[in-house]
């Protein structure tokens, strides 16, 4: 990735929702700006809102949602454009544990089923191991690659099952 691209979706650590817009308007903003707010894309967004338990909040303002709900809105906004590459900066940081597990399983499924590539930035090593094919460990500033771990023993194992897999603890 060397610049803006329609094939890349970015989800920053903070939700970046506009307080004066409804949730629907926030999650479809990228589609509107790109001229892609078609009935098919809107149907996809409705499915995502339903999947993440936010369908009843589509006309609410961001200030009326919890931090976890806002983070799920940011994820929906990122997925709405159906990018091929996902850049996810601490995407689960505002989520409670149960929601974190459910959303991470969803992202894993989306990546696998739709053949997407994702770059996940996290400080949680168990989260990285649960979600990834490969973990790149960076040094503190300036970031330099310290090591790369290929998680071959966990290939194809979904995030929730990875945590119980005998190889999981060996990656720490």
What is each model feature region?
Residues 60-63, 81:
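Conserved signature/switch motifs of ABC ATPase nucleotide-binding domains
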Residues 86-89:
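Catalytic Walker B motif of ABC-type/P-loop ATPase nucleotide-binding domains
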């Amino acid at each position: 990735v060397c610049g803006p691209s329609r094939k890349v979706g970015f989800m920053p650590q903070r939700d970046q929702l506009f307080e004066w817009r409804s949730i629907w308007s926030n999650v479809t903003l990228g589609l509107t700006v790109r001229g892609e707010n078609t009935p098919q894309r809107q149907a996809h967004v409705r499915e995502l809102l339903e999947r993440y338990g936010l369908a009843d909040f589509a006309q609410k303002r961001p200030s009326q949602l919890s931090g976890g709900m806002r983070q799920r809105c940011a994820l929906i906004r990122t997925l709405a454009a159906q990018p091929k590459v996902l850049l996810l900066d601490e995407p689960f940081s505002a989520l409670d544990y149960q929601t974190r597990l459910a959303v991470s399983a969803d992202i894993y499924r989306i990546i696998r089923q739709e053949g997407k590539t994702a770059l996940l930035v996290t400080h949680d090593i168990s989260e990285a191991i649960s979600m990834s094919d490969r973990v790149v460990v960076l040094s503190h500033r300036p970031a330099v690659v310290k090591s790369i771990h290929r998680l071959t023993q966990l290939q194809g194992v979904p995030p929730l099952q990875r945590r119980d897999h005998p190889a999981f603890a060996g990656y720490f």
